[in-house]
Every structure is written in structure tokens, then in C-alpha cells.
Amino acid sequence: MRGYHGDRGSHPRPARFADQQHMDVGPAARAPYLLGSREAFSTEPRFCAPRAGLGHLSPEGPLSLSEGPSSVGPEGGPGGVGAGGSSSTFPRMYPGQGPFDTCEDCVGHPQGKGATRLLPTFLDQFEKQLPVQQDGFHTLPYQRGPAGPGPGPGSGAAPEARSESPSRIRHLVHSVQKLFAKSHSLEAPGKRDYNGPKAEGRSSSGGDSYSGPGSGGPPTSHHHHHHHHHHHHQSRHGKRSKSKDRKGDGRHQTKATGWWSSDDNLDSDSGFLGGRPPGEPGGPFCLDAPDGSYRDLSFKGRSGGSEGRCLACTGMSMSLDGQSVKRSAWHTMMVSQGRDGYPGAGPGKGLLGPETKAKARTYHYLQVPQDDWGGYPTGGKDGEIPCRRMRSGSYIKAMGDEESGDSDGSPKTSPKALARRFASRRSSSVDTARINCCVPPRIHPRSSIPGYSRSLTTGQLSEEFNQQLEAVCGSVFGELESQAVDALDLPGCFRMRSHSYLRAIQAGCSQDDDCLPLLAAPASVSGRPGSSFNFRKAPPPIPPGSQAPPRISITAQSSTDSAHESFTAAEGPARRCSSADGLDGPTMGARTLELAPVPPRASPKPPTLIIKTIPGREELRSLARQRKWRPSIGVQVETISDSDTENRSRREFHSIGVQVEEDKRRARFKRSNSVTAGVQADLELEGLAGLATVATEDKALQFGRPFQRQASEPQPGPRAPTYSVFRTVHTQGQWAYREGYPLPYEPPATDGSPGPPPVPAPGPGSGRRDSWMERGSRSLPDSGRTSPCPRDGEWFIKMLRAEVEKLEHWCQQMEREAEDYELPEEILEKIRSAVGSTQLLLSQKVQQFFRLCQQSLDPTAFPVPTFQDLAGFWDLLQLSIEDVTLKFLELQQLKANSWKLLEPKEEKKVPPPIPKKPSRGRGVPVKERSLDSVDRQRQEARKRLLAAKRAASFRHSSATESADSIEIYIPEAQTRL
């Protein structure tokens, strides 16, 4: 595309002839056709028509590939190259870089007679002379394969001239690498100087001026102008000019026969910047399309102001709100696929063949935001390119391996170091401002982010993540409490999709500098008790240093590890849920929870965490009790880790993903193995009242009546904080039942709140629930948590026991009533009916369900009931329990009415219409029959009503569930962070 003499490629000259390059100015010399950088190019993309017989341009033959762009320019000056002209091969970081980073390739046409012609080999020599800084990354150029010859006779030869220069290729590769190192690492400006001088030196060779052979402008002026532009726009076009250079020789020719270097597809792929006035930084440099195929290929002028710019170039400048690639600018383009790099089919893609484009797109750019941009030890890393955007598959692979291998390596502080730093930071006051979590992730250098949000292959991510996780866990847990380590049951490999992982990390980790999402201790959301914090996309707040070691809950949102709840039973009613162990020590006097005055670091809710803290319950917040379902939290630290794991009543962390609890407490991973069964837990801090009311809602949906497990609610002796945590578990498909853990239950460790059944009698029912709440909080015994899905069977057993206990209590109460009072036979019949139905239910369905639950907990059982099976059976069981509950409810009403039948009133009301129909003689029998029928009708109506309610609630839950599940999986569906 850049005018190449047909002869240009015909006999490349070795570097030793470099001096001749300067001297060969005669038309006979293979003067490179230099497009004048300031050539007035029309702003519209110019497809420079190949100049037809340009034989006179070069004695050796008409131009082959480089026909015309120069002539097209309004002012086709002789693109003579001034000594100062900058070559585009060097990445230019200087803002002054000219709009067109002309390629040395452009050196193809003899400028006017007076134009200084640089021999193409001069570039090679120059490259050899220039000290190439090793970047540490070597990309092997691979032959692109022959491309169609350009229209000009010499087209075939010209490309070869370029491709034949290995030093040229190496130089291009290094230039690209350096460019990325510069633009993305933003290493010290001093390092960039080589771009300036080298660029200048090259520019002299690199033909900065675009000019047609016929044009006769002063070469040097164009050249200098261009050079300045280079410096001004190097950040943006350094790459382009670089690849442009390559294009001229290696790439545009490559189309014909060149080599594609691994960096070939980089931003400057399309030499065309269309649609900009030449003076503009992005001014169009229209390389003559060497042949129709190129022209057809895709020089579609972009219609935007930034048209023709590769996102990689402009994205950096735009990424941080106009900040030129500073700090983590790249993470905005983090996982962008190659096609994302080039917005539209604009010049960015212009010269790439479709195959190359496809190839380019297949790889994600591996962009490693330099965390602190200082995080990389500068020593010895001069050439290293933190941004691995080289697209060749082997290159990426190598880079990925390298990075996964040294994920803990120098480029980023190792997770252990980060963990230690984090721990020390935690101990030292953590800037509380961050507690507000709302800091956009970008603002923090994310030096601690383990993955650098690299989009590696999933395998690499898994390996890297595992390594980092192990390192972090090792250091964190070592620094945290060893007990945490005990509870920590990290799965060997977190199966996570790279994008969800990146997303999680970005959301959780990138938020704070060293707030390793892993270690990001929840910022102690300052103890404004009543406030509800919406940690919706904020990074987990870093807790004030005073907080206890954070609980690390790593929720990798692996689709397979959908919901892991870690329950930790806590004994000790007076346990404060001190979200942080630190809280344990100081007792928050005012707090009913004995919360340490230290603002408990509310466990960093996953980005979607909404923490509602009950006024006194700072710790509740830390308990993350109200954690609204957290979609995929990357790595989350729950500061709730209570040292008194045993005392902390069970903390549960539902994270849709692997969640590691630091607590020794049976922090078990509850992992529902089916991807679709991702259980989402809404932990809601609710007062007992809420518990009682909620418990009776949607029986079918909220199976787990407030399973008031005294969940780490350290209810101080007074148990004043009788807030129970409701976890509404949405089982992705069907039920959303609520568990209220804090209910301390009675002796039966499984004393869940009566739960589903409506409180039958206000006295026994609600009173009972309250009493349960107040009864000492007893942690459930460790029911073997070894089952694959312990939570499912175990939870249902607990709920079942609560129901059984409730029903037995009612039966005993009614039996005592029957014994203590002389009740009418009708009432006694009702009592016997209720008690008999209850006993039958307990002896049959309840036993059956209990066996199913046990079976689900038994790994050896062959048909292991799934969570859905248990939930479905539980739902059916609830129907029977509801029937029995209705009977007891009726008995409670009778008792409230001094055991006087309420029915007679109804009989008086109901019979009158009936007698009207039948003869009075049969009135009495009809009345009796009507009474019976009324009773049956009433029962049937109740059943129908219950069924309708259940169905409606089920549909509602299903709808909400489906919505939730959609949200859950959105992260996995997205490929951008």
C-alpha cells in the first residue's frame, strides 16, 4: 500500500549499504516512496488509486504495491525524508507524533527529483544499529502465506524485500512489544526516550512524508512535521505507525507475501486512518491499497471522530475517563476480544485479511493492568510488556503459561505478600473512607489483584487462581487465625469460567488497591445501625484495622459451585456475632449484641450485598445477614470470622460460588452440585417479629421457616437482639424458602421456628415462636456435614424436627386440655381427630421424609435424593401439616372461646336457607346433613384456598427464581468485566 517500487523488494540491500541509502537520491536509486506526513490528505478516506504507469518513477520498474497514495494527496510533496523524520516502527509515546506514523514501508516512491530517497535497507541497517531493548517476549513471525501480487509488476518482490529482513521483523516485534510496554506499563518516561530518538532516526529512514513521486514538496518539512506528530501522538499511533511500517514492508506486503508477526494484528493493523484531516492526530494516512484486494478488504472510513483508531489506542486514552493509559486503564478493555479492539470495520481492521481478522478475534487480548504500575519490579523488566495483547495463539499461550506460572511472581506482588500487606494494613488503620466501598474499582491501582484480570484460558485461570488462592489462603489464614484454616476447606480447583472469575475479581478485587478481594475485609460499615448499605458494585470495603481477621469467602461463582452456604453452628447464646474477632474482645456495651464498639467491618458484601444493619447490630451487618443474593462474588472476605467459632452461632455464607469460611466452626461448604440449583441466599436481618411473620408466609416457598439457628447472633444474655437471619434461599428453579437462623431453639437442636405452618394458636403458635427465639440459643449439633449436600438434607431434617416438635406440642396440649376439662363430645372428637391426624402424619409421611433426608445425607445411599426431591416432598408434607394445623387452629379458637363450639352459630346461620328448600318435617335431618356438608365444604374450601395460595406462591417464586437465576448466570454469560 505504501508506494513500493517494484524493484524495492527485488533486491533488498544489506545494512552495510545503509550509507548508500542516504546517498541514493537519484531516480535510479530505489528511493522509498515516502508519504509526506503533512501531505494535505483529503479528510475523507482516500483510496489512492494506484498510479498507472509510474515507470518513470523508478528506472527499475513501475511501482508495484505502492501506487498512488501520495499522488492523491492534495499536496503531494516529495515525501523526502528529512533526517529527523520519525519512523513509525518505533512505538512512539510522544504526543507530538504525527497523524500518520508513516511506515518505513512508505518509502517506496522516488519523491520528486529533489526528494531524498532512503533505501529500504537503510531501515534494516538502522534497526540493526538501534539498540533493541529486549522485551523478554519473543514472538516468532510466522509467514502469512503469499498474498495476491499487487497491481504493480514488482509487487511480489517488494514484499519479499521486507520479509527477507529478519532484523526488520525482529525490530518490528520488539517495537510492538515496547509499544505495549510503554503504553500499558507506562514505565518511567525515561524508558520511552528511545522511542523519541530512535523514532527520529528511523523516521529519517522511515519515510515520514507521504508524497507521490510526482509531488514535489520539501521532503524534510513533511518529515519534520510528521515527526512532531509522531511525538505528539505516539501514544496513540505509535502502534499504528509501527504496524504501518510493518504494513508497508511486512504487513501490507504481507498481504502479498509478508510475514505476520504475532503482533501484526495490533491496532495499527489497518494502516488506514480514514476520515481525518491530515493535520489531525488521527489524520488519515492513506496508504495506497497495494492491490484491489486490499482496497476491497476493508478500508471503510470510520464515521466517527475517533474513526480509524484502534480501541487499543483510543481505548486506553478513553478508558480512564480520558486519562491516557494511566494505571489500570486497560482493565476497561479487559477481556475485549480482538474484534472489540477495533470498533467496527474501520481502519483498525482495514488491511487484515478476513482470516487474519478471525484469527485476531479468536484470542482475547491478554491485558494486564499494571496494578500500581509500579507494582512491577522495574529492574530487569525494561522490555517486558505487561499488556499481553500480542495475538498470535502461541504467543498468547506462552504468555498465558508464563503468567499463570508467575502469577505469584514479580509482576504482581505475590498473593502471600499481598495477604501480609493486607493483614498489616488491616491492623494499621485501613482507610475507613474505603468503607464506603463505593470507590470505582478503576480508581485503585489494583496492584493486589491476583489475576490482573488476565483473560487466560479457563484452565490457566483455574491454575492461576488456585495458586493464588492457595498462596493467599496460606498467608491469610496463617496470619488470620489458624482455626480459620481448619474450617477452610478449599476445593482443589475452583471451576470457574474465566469471565465470571474475571468479573468477580474485577468487581471484588480490583476495587481496592490491596483489598485483595480475597482479603478485602468487609469495611466496617460504620456502625450506623439502621443504615442499609448497598454495596452493590462496590469493592468489598476494607475493614478498619481493628476488625477481626476477615473471613475469606471466595465465591468464584463457578456455575457448578452455585451456592455454597457455610453454616457454622455457634453455641453460646451470648456470643456476639462479632463480625470481626476484634469485636469479640470489646463488648459493644450499647449494642444488645455485645458488638464491639469497634465498627464491625460489615463483611464485605459481595458487590451486590445490601447490608441492613439493625441498629445495635453492627455485627449483624458483619454477619452479612441481609446479604441480598450475591451473584458471583469473586473472592470475598467475611470478616465475620469469629474466633469463637463454636460460640458464633452458625454463620452462613451463601455465595454463588466457592466460599471459604475462615471459621473453624463447621464452616462447611455447602455446595449444591447441580449448576442450576445454585441456591441464592438472602440473608436478611430481621427482628423476631419479622421472623414470625415471615415464617408463615408462602409455606411452600419458605420451607425453612425461620430456621432460627441463633445464627452467630451473639445474643447477649438478654438475647435482646432477637433478630433472626432469614435466608431466603432461591433455589434457582423453584422454591424460595426462608431460613431464619438466629432462632435459638429449644433442646432439640433442630428447633427451627414453627416455620411453614401458620401459627395455629396465637398463644402456642406465636408465643411459641417467641419462646423459641428467646429460649437459649443452642447450636445444632454437628450433624454429619460430610454429605455432598449436607445443607439440603440437614436443613430439611432441622425443619422437620421443628415441625414435629410443634405438632407434638400441640397434641400434648390438646390432650391435656381434654383431660383437664370436661369438654363436649364434639370438641373431644375434634381433639381426637386433630391428634390422630397428627400422629398418623408423624408416623408416616414425616418418617418417610425424615428417611429421605437421612438418605440425602448418606453418601453411600444409592438413590441420593436431590435437593429438589426433598423440597418437593417437603412441599407435599406441608400440605398435610397445613391440614393438621387447621385443626389445631380451630381447637385454639375453641379454647379461646372457653371451649364453646363456634359451630352452633354457624349452624344457626346456615340452616335457615336449607329449611326453605326441603319440607320442615325433614328440616332437622337436613340441618344435620347440611352441617356435615358445611363442615366438609369449609374444609374443602380451605384446601382449595391453600392449594391456590401454594400454586400462586410457587408461580411467584418460580418467576422470581427465574429472574434470580438469570441474574446469577449473567456474569457467566458476559465476556467483559
UniProtKB/Swiss-Prot annotation:
Record field: compositional bias (Basic residues): 221-245
Coiled coil: none
Comp. bias (Low complexity): 53-73, 202-212, 258-271
Biased composition (Gly residues): 74-85
Protein's cellular compartments: Cell membrane; Postsynaptic density; Synapse
MF (Gene Ontology): amyloid-beta binding; molecular adaptor activity; PDZ domain binding; protein domain specific binding; scaffold protein binding
Keywords per UniProt: Cell membrane, Membrane, Phosphoprotein, Synapse
Quaternary data: Interacts with DLG1 and DLG4/PSD-95.
Role played: May play a role in the molecular organization of synapses and neuronal cell signaling. Could be an adapter protein linking ion channel to the subsynaptic cytoskeleton. May induce enrichment of PSD-95/SAP90 at the plasma membrane.
Protein family per UniProt: Belongs to the SAPAP family.
The protein's name: Disks large-associated protein 3
Source organism per UniProt: Rattus norvegicus (Rat)
Top-level taxonomy: Eukaryota, Metazoa, Chordata, Craniata, Vertebrata
